């Protein structure tokens, strides 16, 4: 069984326009990102909404997709976009 631990979000990365999702996966540090576009389009956030807050409000769904992708072998640096939800 895969050992996956989520630790919340790691803040907003303005250069990537995404919220960092730090993950411990089988002892390795993995970084996924959730795009601002996904937060706006798929989770109904207002354009001026705090990306971290929108992430927190939808954390369960985000973690479910991240878990699926980890099991499929998608590694460090994966960006979750609106199409992933």
Residue ranges and their predicted role:
Residues 18-43:
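A short, structured beta-strand/loop element
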Residues 12, 32-33, 55:
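Aromatic side chains
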Residues 3-6, 46-85:
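Acidic, low-complexity intrinsically disordered segments
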Residues 10, 16, 36-37, 59, ...:
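Generic alpha-helical secondary structure signal
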Residues 2, 17-19, 28-30, 74-78:
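Generic structural motif recognizing short loop/turn segments at the entrances and edges of beta-strands
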Residues 1-23:
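Short, charged/polar N-terminal "headpieces" of proteins
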